[in-house]
Amino acid sequence: MHFFSPAKLNIFLQLLGKREDGFHEIVTRYQAVSFGDQLSLSVSSRDSFQIINDCQLEISNNSIWKSTALFRQYTGITDPVSWRVVKHIPIGSGLAGGSSNAATALFALNQMFQTGLSDEELRSLAEKVGMDTPFFFSSGSALGLGRGEKVVTLNELVVDRYILYFSNKGVLTSEAFAVVKPSDCSLSKDLEYARNDLENPVFRLRLDLKEKKRWLEDLWKGIPVYVGLTGSGATLFVRYPKALEKNSAYATQIQKIIALSGGVSTSPIQRDTPNWYPTILEA
């Protein structure tokens, strides 16, 4: 059985202040996109795991096996399984590759063994793997509240195009939050104008990302785009309405810039419950 494991963008992220437990209260917009990994699952004589395209992923202690262990504990099903993962989402890119793989694994196991677990049950298991893992059981577009674990599904799909720009080095979320200053937190509650409040903290740690954002803004100058950081990075993205591509002048210019800059083009996708995300590896 084969399943698409989509990347996730934080279209915006507002820091609303530090809580009594030491964590920051946030409001963020999650969006699943058509760029992602491919997971394959089969029953086997013994547990096995094969990773393609990325040797940095741990074989024995990754989010897929964590989900497998949780599923087995919850259902009592311990049949050996074989996982094969084709990785496209870079490790530490801020695109929630590990969280997406974990959620996809839970869904896949539920399908494979026909256990009939509800989305709510799967979401509850997903919470034990990662803060944003439950998001993937939404429609594919949602608000993240609290520390990001409270997911409010949004039904509308933003018709935008995203161009992703990866970095060779990731940013740990804990490191980004450790250097947050009170002045970084949003004063406005107007989500229409929200940006990523983690940008300045991350840029204090990574001057190269700040310079790369400036380079992208200069490169895309003359086209109505937004350039931002997703989550705590280290992926930068360019966002623009897909309608621009119907303008021949813009369309030609956009394709030239993408070819020159090495960006990866992707689009928003939705999940049609009770199915999983459509297998779209290209936008």
UniProtKB/Swiss-Prot annotation:
Protein's UniProt keywords contain Ligase? no
* Pathways per UniProt: Isoprenoid biosynthesis; isopentenyl diphosphate biosynthesis via DXP pathway; isopentenyl diphosphate from 1-deoxy-D-xylulose 5-phosphate: step 3/6
What EC number is given for this enzyme?
2.7.1.148
Q: Which Pfam families match?
A: GHMP_kinases_N
The alphabetized UniProt keywords are:
ATP-binding, Isoprene biosynthesis, Kinase, Nucleotide-binding, Transferase
Biological processes, Gene Ontology terms:
isopentenyl diphosphate biosynthetic process, methylerythritol 4-phosphate pathway; terpenoid biosynthetic process
What reactions does this protein catalyze? 4-CDP-2-C-methyl-D-erythritol + ATP = 4-CDP-2-C-methyl-D-erythritol 2-phosphate + ADP + H(+)
Signal sequence region: none
Q: Which residues form the active site?
A: 8, 132
Query: Which residues does the record give as ATP binding sites?
Result: 90-100
Query: What Gene Ontology terms describe what this protein does at the molecular function level?
Result: 4-(cytidine 5'-diphospho)-2-C-methyl-D-erythritol kinase activity; ATP binding
Q: Identify the enzyme class.
A: transferase
This molecule's function is given as: Catalyzes the phosphorylation of the position 2 hydroxy group of 4-diphosphocytidyl-2C-methyl-D-erythritol.
Q: Which family does it belong to?
A: Belongs to the GHMP kinase family. IspE subfamily.
The record's annotation in PANTHER family points to: 4-DIPHOSPHOCYTIDYL-2-C-METHYL-D-ERYTHRITOL KINASE, CHLOROPLASTIC
Q: What is this protein called?
A: 4-diphosphocytidyl-2-C-methyl-D-erythritol kinase
Q: What is the lineage of its organism?
A: Bacteria, Pseudomonadati, Chlamydiota, Chlamydiia, Chlamydiales
Q: Coding gene?
A: ispE
